[in-house]
Amino acid sequence: MAHFPGFGQSLLYGYPVYVFGDCVQGDWCPISGGLCSARLHRHALLATCPEHQITDPIDGRVIGSALQFLIPRLPSFPTQRTSKTLKVLTPPTTHTTPNIPPSFFQAVRQHSPFRNGCMEPTLGQQLPSLSFPDPGLRPQNLYTLWGSSVVCMYLYQLSPPITWPLLPQVIFCHPGQLGAFLTNVPYKRMEELLYKIFLNTGALIILPEGCLPTTLFQPIRAPATLTAWQNGLLPFQSTLTTPGLIWTFSDGTPMISGPCPKDGQPSLVLQSSSFIFHKFQTKAYHPSVLLSHGLIQYSSFHSLHLPFEEYTNIPISLLFNKREADDTDYGPRIPPGGLEPPSEKHFHETEV
């Protein structure tokens, strides 16, 4: 399900980007307005980022580093390739597979809305079958239930490519629910399982307050954040640099961030509004800020609900101006005749 290297189109802004291969994990890059993964030493930066410009070894275009994977990319188109460049530009595979007991998957199938080997959430769209492939391949996502919400645990990189800004660097997990699937497993073993997941992924793990009675799995050992959950929503936390993975619509309908269901289809749906794009026109806002304020939402379905009229006329200077890319404050600049910003009640912060 790999996407060939080539030129594509930005999912959000519509500008051309260069795609080297499968997308990878990353963080928000305020300089370029793209994504950057320092841990993996791979970058997802715009071709116009002044600090990361190099020449494409194939056709001489200015694109970025040879280890860069530009996100977003939708769609991607083939370009001239050689076996040498493909070897350099294709990301490595994951060489290990997590050891998850079969009873977990059996219980998920029993307690989840599985139909024909796929999960069917309330929005009526199918997600890939829950499974882990053979070692040497990238496992797909792991889905479970918490309350009335479907919870997705990203254990490894996605097998299909992902799109901006959905990042498998935050694991949103409820150990009690996980323990319900694993019979006769004490909490200490749950903590050890989570800690092993952290060691294999390097992900930040978000746990509900008071979920573990012991102190084995604490921030001193791994970057675990204990915080209150509100109907599956991850509250805003200034310490988080990536958005959480599980969100719900305003009416409480769960949304699941997952891989694209079919080859060539987007894994990200950005539900837009005019105010969101006024914010994007003025500042490269961090996606977690927009998420926490309820301004953007995610799901993993077939269509992209993004009216093109809302961003086709955005001046390029607003996207790449250094001052506008500075995300040190969250106060939007409303252009003349633009929409008013939301009231302060939309900007709640939750202390951890």
Swiss-Prot record:
Expression induction or repression: Down-regulated by P30II.
Region named Disordered: 327-352
Region: Transactivation, residue numbers: 288-321
Cellular component terms per the entry's GO annotation: host cell cytoplasm; host cell nucleus
Stretches for region Interaction with CREBBP C-terminus: 311-318
Family recorded in the similarity comment: Belongs to the deltaretrovirus Tax protein family.
Comment field on protein domains: The 48 N-terminal residues contain a non-canonical functional nuclear localization signal (NLS). The PDZ-binding domain mediates binding to human DLG1 and MAGI3. Interaction with other PDZ domain-containing protein induces IL2-independent growth.
Function as written in the Swiss-Prot or TrEMBL entry: Transcriptional activator that governs the viral transcription from the 5'LTR via the recruitment of dimers of host phosphorylated CREB1. Together they bind cAMP response elements within the viral promoter and mediate high-level viral transcription. Increases host CREB1 O-GlcNAcylation to further increase 5'LTR transactivation. Also modulates the expression of cellular genes leading to the deregulation of T-cell proliferation, perturbing the integrity of cell cycle checkpoints, the DNA damage response and apopototic pathways.
Stated name of the protein: Protein Tax-1
Gene: tax
